[in-house]
C-alpha cells in the first residue's frame, strides 16, 4: 500500500512538472506537428550626422582721410564661413529565426549603408590699392588714399586669407622687416553622451590667434611681413603651409557638432 502511494505521488509530481514546462515553452500544435517560434531583432547604431562649421573672422583697421586732410581710422570685419555636413547611416541588422521540430532554420539579414556630404563656403572681399616699393628702406610720397584687400585662396591642402590696409597722406619713410610668427592655439573639447535620452552631442571649439607684437623666429613655414611707417601703421600676413591660413589679426573658430542616436 505504501508502494502504491509513493508511485502515485511520483506520477503526480512528474505530471505537474511536465505541465509547467509545457506552459513555459508555449508549444503550438497544428495538424499534428509541434512548432516553436523565436524572433530575435537587433539594431546596430543608427544614423550619425556630423556638422562642422569653420568661421574665419578678420578684423582690420582702415585709415580714412577726412575733408580737412586729417587722418582717422575705422574698423571693419571680414567673415568667411565654411560648413561641412556629413550624414552616415551605419549598418542596421535584423535577424529572424524560425525553428521547427525538424530542425529547420531560416536567417534573414539586411544591411543599409548611406553616406551624404554637403560642403558650403561663402567669402566676403573688398578692393585694394597698395604703394609701390623698390628697396628695403626708401622714401615715398603717397596721395591720401585708403586701400583694403581681402583675398581667399582655397585648394585641397591650403586656404589663405590675406588682408591689407595702407594709407598715407604725407612723405613717409618706410622700411620692410621680415620675421617668423608662431600662432597661439587653444583648444577646448566638450563631450556629452546619454543612453537614456537616446542622443549624444560632441562639440569641440578651437581658437587660433596670432600676435603682431612679439614675432618669434622659430618656424620657417609661417611667414610674417611688416611694413612700418612713422605712424606705426603696418601690413602683416601670416601664411601657414598646412590646412590653415589666417591674417595676424584673424580669429579662427572651428565648431564640430555630432548628433548621434543610441538604441537602448
Swiss-Prot record:
Bilayer topology: Lipid-anchor; GPI-anchor
Subcellular location(s) of the protein: Secreted, Cell wall; Membrane
InterPro entries the UniProt entry points to: DSE2 (IPR026225)
Signal peptide interval: 1-23
Biased amino acid composition, Acidic residues: 93-104
The keyword Nucleus appears for this protein: no
Biased composition (Low complexity): 75-92, 105-147, 157-168, 178-211
A biological process term (GO) from this entry: cell wall organization
Alphabetical keyword list: Cell wall, Cell wall biogenesis/degradation, Glycoprotein, GPI-anchor, Lipoprotein, Membrane, Secreted, Signal
Chief localisation class: secreted
Proregion residues excised on maturation: 248-264
Domain of life: Eukaryota
Function summary: Involved in pseudohyphal growth, cell wall metabolism and required for the separation of the mother and daughter cells.
Record-level GO cellular component terms: extracellular region; side of membrane
Lipidation positions, renumbered (GPI-anchor amidated aspartate): 247
Region (Disordered): 75-213
Name recorded for this polypeptide: Protein DSE2
